[in-house]
Each structure stands twice: as C-alpha cells, then as structure tokens.
Amino acid sequence: MSSQPDASQLSTLNSRILKQYWGYDRFRGIQEDIIDSISKNKDTLGLMPTGGGKSITFQVPALAKEGMCLVITPLIALMKDQVQNLKKRGIKALAIYSGMSRQDIIITLENCIFGNYKFLYISPERLDTEIFRTKLRKMHISMITVDESHCISQWGYDFRPAYLKIAEIRELLPDVPVLALTATATPEVVKDIQARLHFRHKNVFRMSFERNNLAYIVRKTENKTAELLHILRSMPGSAIVYVRNRRRTKEITELLNNEYITADFYHAGLDDATKDIRQHRWQSGESRVMVATNAFGMGIDKPDVRIVIHMDLPDSIEAYFQEAGRAGRDGQKAYAVILYAKSDKTTLHKRIPDTFPEKEYIRDVYEHLQYYYQMAMGDGLDCVREFNIEDFCRKFKYFPVPVDSALRILTQAGYLEYTAEQDSTSRILFTIRRDELYRLREMGEDMDRLIQAVLRSYTGVFTDYTYINEDSLAIRTGLTRRQIYEQLVHLAKLRIVSYIPRKKTPYIIYTRERIEAQRIHISPEVYEHRKARYETRINAMLDYVTNDTVCRSRMLLDYFGERNEHNCGQCDTCISLRSKSKASEQPDRETLCAKVCEILSCESLTPAGLLKQLPMDKELLTEILHRLSDEGKIIAVDGILQIKK
C-alpha cells in the first residue's frame, strides 16, 4: 500500500481531481476550506445552503484518500442519483437502503470489502444491523460523511433517531474523521450536531445563507387564485408552485392550463414514469410551471427558476428556506413568494394534532397493523412488509395523514421503520459474457440499439447491478419508454440480463418483535418535547408572514444565527418601509399650499417654474394648484400663475 500524501500534496491532488472528474478549475465558496479540513483528518461541520455544492466537499477528498468513504444519508432518491452520477464519471460507488433483500445487501457489502469501491451510500436505519457492523470492520474506511446532519439533533425540524447510531459507528472506527453537512441548522442544532457526532474539537465552516438575488415577498390576500394568476402573468420565467396536498396540485394545474399558462403537477403518489416525464418537460421548458407538494425539488438541477410560490404555509422556517432557495440558483434576479390569508393561521395550528395524534391513537394504529399483516404476538423481528396506506385506512376506517404521523412516531420510538413512498430505481445486470453479445444482433435493430445505448451509458453492467433510467434510454434510442421496458423484459426471459424494474414501494420493517399495544412506550423526548418544538417552529413561521416591520432576509438569517446589519432593500417589507419613509418626508398639503402662495406673492410663475422650487412631484403640484384655484386664492393668466388680488 502506498503512503498517504501529506496535507499540501492532498490540496494539490484535490484540485487535480476536481478538474479531472468535474471539469472545474476552482472550488466555490467554502468548498475548499471544508475539503482542506477533512483532508487533514479533522472532524468538520459544513453549513451550506441549498445549491451550495455539498457533494463536492466529500466526493473530492474521498477520491484523494486511500480507502472508501461511508456516506450516511436519509434521501434514498438522492443517494441513487449520486451513485449513478459517480458511475458515469468512472467512479465506483454502491448504495444500501431500506427495502433491499438480505442477499443484495450481503453482495453489496462483500463488494465494498474486496471490490476497490470509493463510496458506500447507506441509509441511517441500516447502520444498526449486525451484518453491516460485522462487514464494516473488514472495510478500509477513509472518512465518514453525514448528509442532512441536522437529523441527528432533537432540536432540528427533522430529527431521526437512527442518526444517533452514528456515534456507535464512530466508536468502531475511532481514527476515521467525520464530515457533517447540512443546509439548515439553527445555532442550537449546530452545537448539538458536533456533540452527538463526538467531534474531537469544534470545527464549523459556514457559507452565508444570504441570497442577494432572491427577493422574499409575502402577499396578504383573501383570493390566492387571483393573486397567483396575477404574479405568473406579471413575472416571466420558470416557476414552482408549492401546495399542501395532492388534490390541490391537480386543481391548480388545471386552472393554470385553462388560463394558457403551461403547467404540470407532481406529488409522491404518481407512478415513476409520469414523474420522470413531467420533470423532464418542466426542466426542458416545455412546461413553465410545476405545481407540487414538498415531494418535489430535492436534487433537482434547474438553476433558472425565476419564482417559487407557496400557496400554503410550510410548517417551519427550515422547510420554507430550503424550498424558496430553489429559485435563482443561476445568480439572476428571482422571487420567493408566500400567499397568506388570515385563515392560514388556524389551518397551520390544526396541523399539530395531525402531526402528533394522541398516544392512544398511535397504539391503536400499531395494533391494527398487526391485524393487517396477521402477525402473531412475539413475531415480526426484522420482518419487511410492503405497506399500502390507502388500503390500510379503508379497512380500519382511518384518515391517512394522522396514520402516517403515527407510523413516524412509532419509528422514532424504535418499534418499527416506516419508509413512505420509496422509489426503487430500475437495475440491470448482464448474465452473459461481453464476448457473447454478437449473437444478440440477430434479435433485431431495436434490440441492438438498446444494448448499444446501455453499454455506452453505463459502466459495470457485466459485474454488478447497475441503476438505469428507461427514459434516458428511450431518448438515446428513439424508442418509447414502453418499448424499452418490453425489450428488457424479453432479455430477462431469455436469461441474457437480470432486470429489476422501478417500483414505488412504501415499506414497514419491524425492528422489534410484536408486543401488546398497551406496552408501547412513547417517551417525552419522542413525543412531548418534539411536539413543543414543532409548535415553536409553527409560531416562528407565523411570525415571519405576519411581520411588516423587519427585513425578511434579515429575519431569515437571524433565525439561522447569521447576523446582518443591512436590509436587503428588495423584500416587500423593505419596499413598504421605503414608501412610507418617502411619504413621511413630504410636507403636508396645508404647508405646501402656504408655500405656493408665498412664492407666487413674490413673483408670477408657470407651473413648470413653480415645480423647480418645490419638493413635490408633478401630480401633487397639480392637486395643490386645483385646490388653491377652487378656494379662489390663485388664478392663471395665459398660463402664468399669480395670486388673486
């Protein structure tokens, strides 16, 4: 094994890797500071807003180091996307996430030990399994990356108990440095992340959350639909409209299309092909507006979004800041608009019992879950079951939203693991040798085009299951997505490939055997404390939208612990305060009338000549002159103004 480069050599190597694999000549913002820190094996926390280039900060130093980077992230769709992007660059990467079979997990872990891979992406829930920890001891891990690291903090808006297991992984790898990354963290969360990840020394790098090109606007209106149409007609460019539920996505989309504003809708309940097609139409500009729930946006690469509009209030500043931040990533002028009605305050407070249903309700959901799966007392440990929430609610007369919340709380309490709306990306593995491909040419031109497109687009298809995108293959071959699917199924039947199609599958995984519902213990940390913090975040959101005296950009920055002494000058509050200031600077009308009379008593003037001597605009002067004329105090003779004798 070659010796590890020193810090200065690593810095040079990092720059060379950036150029070789990504084509960039230099790092952006604080990327280089973070990379230098982790390259020196220092535990590091990087605070970077959405679109700040987080992935570069761990992918570059990991390639410079010997061994493999362990990447812990809860975002399964993003995990798969990054693995695929790394493979396209010729970098070996694998992923383990909820829903994979035990055999697939074992094969993946064995490849990490013997296959010279550089990255293993893993969901936090998988860290606690015996098989992972056994195999981990045999791996050469160079660094640990914790993405969405705010999830480890109970002060955070998205606390996940599985993240607490990372500290145990650190004990197994005591000499391995950790890089924690997040786009949203308050000062309390920043401290908590470092403590819970057992940082040897406090070490934080912050990229400013200020967005000089993004204007934050709150429009108070009781007719949100009319205001939405007005905004989209007034402001050109690509847009995202966020709404709270799936039904509204369709309703708003139909409204916009009827008004000749091209729009599509997107939510987690759509099938994968529909999602991909609509996302492609929007990204290519074929559809101007994407109307979506918060399921849309993570990992979307579209820098020219000009406006993000929230028709409904998010339930935290953190969520709003992340969604609003998808506008204007190209650095050009953009807008983030919230439409706020008085009824929104009541609506937001009603989310509290939906998000934290009564404990007895949660126990009832747990018990009915056992009836649903016909699970005996004491059974269930490590059982994986697909879960159809609509079917479950229909059978047991529940509403989906509080059931979803109950399952999340049971996950937090450690009784099960619930992964909602999980997308399983298609995978393919050739089961014949490369030198046998020649015989497939006899199967027709379409088949030959498909195979050639697969070989050109993806590496490693003869040695490992590789994620593929049927829509991309359709574009490259000129075939339809349906034809691609049918051809791959045909190849699988002939045992030429092993093909695992995409599937949208929510899962419930039992992390403990079934117990009596009344024995379910939900601790204050999981329930009461989190509920109180949720209420605090809701109140912060309401303070933001009802505020009319403080610059909105400063208000957001202050929430995340960043001090800023100047106003943005472009939010609705700044514009309103500036208008009021200008109005207050103008003398009152009685004073202006007296001033006009004083000037005209000394000399007769035209209106234009008078305007040069007075601090007012033309419209106001016209109003003053009409008033003085009506009162009989001045007259105009051949266009010359004078005092009436």
Predicted segments, located by residue:
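Helicase motor core with emphasis on the C-terminal RecA-like subdomain
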Residues: 3-21, 25-29, 33-55, 61-65, ...
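Short, Lys/Arg-enriched, disordered terminal segments
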Residues: 1-15, 583-587, 591, 645
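Gly/serine-rich nucleotide phosphate-binding loop at the start of the catalytic core
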Residues: 70-71
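C-terminal accessory region of SF2 helicases/translocases
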Residues: 287, 305, 313-322, 328-638
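A broadly structural signal marking compact, well-ordered functional cores
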Residues: 95, 227, 231, 245, ...
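Intrinsically disordered, low-complexity N-terminal extensions of nucleic-acid-metabolism proteins
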Residues: 1-3, 9, 120, 253, ...
